[in-house]
Amino acid sequence: QLAEQCEALEQGLLELAQGLLAQVRRHPFTLLPTRLIEQRTSARTTFLRWQHIASRRMGVGVWAEMLRQDKTPEYLLQDLYEMELQRITLNMQISLIHSIGKQAAECAEKMGQAEAEFMGRLQQSQARPGYVGM
C-alpha cells in the first residue's frame, strides 16, 4: 500500500516537472543555449537535467555557465535561478519518494515470503496425526 502511494506521489511530482519543462520550452528561454530535459535512469525514475544544446553536456555546471555568460539577459537571471531551485527540489523529492517506494515494495515482498513460510509450517503441523494446537 505504501509503495502504491509513493508511486502516485512520484507521478504527481513528474506532472509538476512537466509544468517546469513547459515553462522552459517557451520564449524567451528557447533562445538560450541551454535547455532543461528529462533523463530516465536505470532505476526507472526520471530527473530533470540542464543540457547544453550544442555540446549535449549535462549538469548544473551547464546552468551555472549560462548564468555567468554576458549573452544571458539580466532580466532572465531571476527566472533561471528560480527554475534551478524548482529543479533541485523536484529532483530531491522524486529521489526520496522513489527510494521510499522501492523500500516499501521490497519490505512487502519479504513480509509476504515470511507469511508464506509461517503458513506453510502451520499447515504442515495441522496435517500431522495427533496434532494438538496450542
Positions of predicted regions on the chain:
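Intrinsically disordered, low-complexity regions
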Residues: E10, A17, P33-T34, W50, ...
